[in-house]
Amino acid sequence: MGEVSAIVLAASQAAEEGGESSNFLIPNGTFFVVLAIFLVVLAVIGTFVVPPILKVLRERDAMVAKTLADNKKSDEQFAAAQADYDEAMTEARVQASSLRDNARADGRKVIEDARVRAEQQVASTLQTAHEQLKRERDAVELDLRAHVGTMSATLASRILGVDLTASAATR
């Protein structure tokens, strides 16, 4: 490029030395040389530099669009999963509440059954004890009635100091 500038500069100096007057409205050769160089550089950049950059930008835009679509899809899946989770938790809470209420009812029933059995056992034990005490009382009463004579004679002999056993035994 340095040579082209030198040539353009030399041509402009030669034109001035030749005595020509330059009109700024009429383009000279330098303008066309610079224009040609600009167009060549523009064509090279447009042909070799811009298409790969545009390709990379399009790929980036496609990747960003895909990422946005994936994010949207993920958000929808998360919302659906959250809704399923909330529904499952609500159902589980209802089921747990039902099981808890059933367990409480069963517990009350078991306690009531145990209480009824205990009351029956107590009543049965009291009845058995009452019957046993009655039998023992009757047995003791019969025993006492059978031995009342000998016991009274022994007691009287202890109190009086006289042996009444022989006379009581004869009776």
Swiss-Prot record:
The keyword Electron transport does not apply. This is ATP synthase subunit b. The chain crosses the membrane at residues 31-51. It comes from the Bacteria. Keywords: ATP synthesis, Cell membrane, CF(0), Hydrogen ion transport, Ion transport, Membrane, Transmembrane, Transmembrane helix, Transport. Belongs to the ATPase B chain family. GO terms for molecular function: proton-transporting ATP synthase activity, rotational mechanism. HAMAP family: ATP_synth_b_bprime. The gene is atpF. InterPro entries: ATP_synth_B-like_membr_sf (IPR028987), ATP_synth_b/b'su_bac/chlpt (IPR002146), ATP_synthase_B_chain (IPR050059). It is a single-pass membrane protein. It is found in: Cell membrane. The keyword ATP-binding does not apply. F(1)F(0) ATP synthase produces ATP from ADP in the presence of a proton or sodium gradient. F-type ATPases consist of two structural domains, F(1) containing the extramembraneous catalytic core and F(0) containing the membrane proton channel, linked together by a central stalk and a peripheral stalk. During catalysis, ATP synthesis in the catalytic domain of F(1) is coupled via a rotary mechanism of the central stalk subunits to proton translocation. GO terms for cellular component: peptidoglycan-based cell wall; plasma membrane; proton-transporting ATP synthase complex. Pfam families: ATP-synt_B. F-type ATPases have 2 components, F(1) - the catalytic core - and F(0) - the membrane proton channel. F(1) has five subunits: alpha(3), beta(3), gamma(1), delta(1), epsilon(1). F(0) has three main subunits: a(1), b(2) and c(10-14). The alpha and beta chains form an alternating ring which encloses part of the gamma chain. F(1) is attached to F(0) by a central stalk formed by the gamma and epsilon chains, while a peripheral stalk is formed by the delta and b chains.
